Swiss-Prot record:
Region (Disordered): 345-370
Gene (UniProt): V-SEA
Biased composition annotated in UniProt, kind: Acidic residues: 357-370
The name this protein goes by in its record: Tyrosine-protein kinase transforming protein SEA
One cellular component term from this protein's GO annotations in UniProt: plasma membrane
Pfam families per the UniProt record, alphabetical: PK_Tyr_Ser-Thr
EC number(s) stated in the UniProt entry for this protein: 2.7.10.2
Family: Belongs to the protein kinase superfamily. Tyr protein kinase family.
Active site location: D186
Other notes: This protein is synthesized as an Env-Sea polyprotein.
InterPro entries, alphabetized: Kinase-like_dom_sf, Prot_kinase_dom, Protein_kinase_ATP_BS, RTK, Ser-Thr/Tyr_kinase_cat_dom, Tyr_kinase_AS, Tyr_kinase_cat_dom
Modified residues (Phosphotyrosine): Y216
Recorded catalytic activity of this chain's protein: L-tyrosyl-[protein] + ATP = O-phospho-L-tyrosyl-[protein] + ADP + H(+)
Annotated ATP binding sites: I66, G67, R68, G69, H70, F71, G72, S73, V74, K92
Amino acid sequence: ADSPGLARPHAHFASAGADAAGGGSPVLLLRTTSCCLEDLRPELLEEVKDILIPEERLITHRSRVIGRGHFGSVYHGTYMDPLLGNLHCAVKSLHRITYLEEVEEFLREGILMKGFHHPQVLSLLGVCLPRHGLPLVVLPYMRHGDLRHFVRAQERSPTVKELIGFGLQVALGMEYLAQKKFVHRDLAARNCMLDETLTVKVADFGLARDVFGKEYYSIRQHRHAKLPVRWMALESLQTQKFTTKSDVWSFGVLMWELLTRGASPYPEVDPYDMARYLLRGRRLPQPQPCPDTLYGVMLSCWAPTPEERPSFSGLVCELERVLASLEGEHYINMAVTYVNLESGPPFPPAPRGQLPDSEDEEDEEEEVAE
């Protein structure tokens, strides 16, 4: 028997034709306002049937917008779950899918996300393929929005303990994803969500990602890729390769965001110069309210070589230790100050041969000038 989600075609993809498909080229969806389940491979349909939400079970409230991005929009929605009843959800529309292969990759990511079950990881309710339009991602509604906006809110007065506690929750979620061999690639405070109980959920991976925000830049070697440069590990900036250890680096930046109540990292550094800056041994400074022990944990996340960085399991233990050592209630205001502006780089500079050519030339010019 057919699954309820597959009883009839929900969408029709207008492909570029059999010739293009047969030639191995990407199949372009000429009319991106409509797309067909029959165009998907049968084996993929069999895999994806468990994540499909029938169109009649989803109401998208398009007049109630949660947010908009270049990649799509997010709306309030109601999912009529056959077991749990009506659920308040977030519905993300995708406007930028133009190839059939992208739709299939999208659905494979949905299969992967549906398998995540952890209190600190945002779950996927399902994917809807409407009769008219492109796929919709259905996610639980997060009442308090993203972590960065939450800690930046003027009306809130989070304590150091509370902020570190948020970081610990993120570390727990990332520990789970690392055990699942899943690399996030875009870990940042803006990509973690808070529900009504202030439980932090690691989010914005896979289907939920929108990489067209102001925090994303093209870098010289990859002009067409939009990357979260200020959160990226040194080796990722150099090779555009990501691992769990590069996620650990990003986690260190996230902790810095929390202890500065959402300040932007490296505001004085041009995004095109990030690799050069880091190769000099420089890192983010210690926020004034940040305990020395916690800053030591951050620095360990930013070790030059991935092997030197802790695991997420190790970070969970370290953060629990830091929290246990704190006494009293310390509040952080929005004026960001630092305690180590006069100190030198925390790591030695890379050998001259590893610096960009222009950097070596600048060093030579400085020596001549002296």
